[in-house]
Amino acid sequence: MVSTLMIASVKLRLYCTALIILCNQKNPSEFNVLIHKLIIKWGFMNKNFHFVSVFFIKF
């Protein structure tokens, strides 16, 4: 259980980093980064890693 959660959090961080880099290349605004931080916090609070990772892939 713990290892699955750790892997999920690492994957989530990777998606987050990639997404922020992509957004900063297209539109470097603090608002975008703030939205992504809120989404990430929501994902961690709900421990809904699958939904968040799917969201990041589709984004």
From Swiss-Prot:
Belongs to the non-disulfide-bridged peptide (NDBP) superfamily. Long chain multifunctional peptide (group 2) family. It comes from the Eukaryota. Its main location: secreted. One of its GO terms (cellular component) is extracellular region. This is Venom protein 37.1. Residues 1-18 form the signal peptide. It is found in: Secreted. Expressed by the venom gland.
